[in-house]
Amino acid sequence: MRWKHKLVYVEWVDASQPVPEWHFFSEIEAGVPVPCRSVGWVHTYNKDILMILPAVTGMDTEHRSGMGSMTIPRSAIRSITAIEIEENYNGNT
């Protein structure tokens, strides 16, 4: 599937948050990957990364703009699902 400019739902895993205190190695417990879910319009999809934007405007013009870009390593992605949207919005884009 060609993903460029598609709205997608992504399930991926991230590193768990670092523990801020010092501990002896013998006291440290293994963390677990954190399951994450994100929704956004695809800006970049290649062999290394998926970049999505949660907010976009002007998608039908040469002045496309987006904010809040998130880059997810492809190795962290568990699934990508295209979201179909109805294109009958009556306001400005």
Task: Identify what each model region corresponds to.
Residues 1-93:
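Conserved RNA-binding domains used in RNP assembly and mRNA/RNA metabolism
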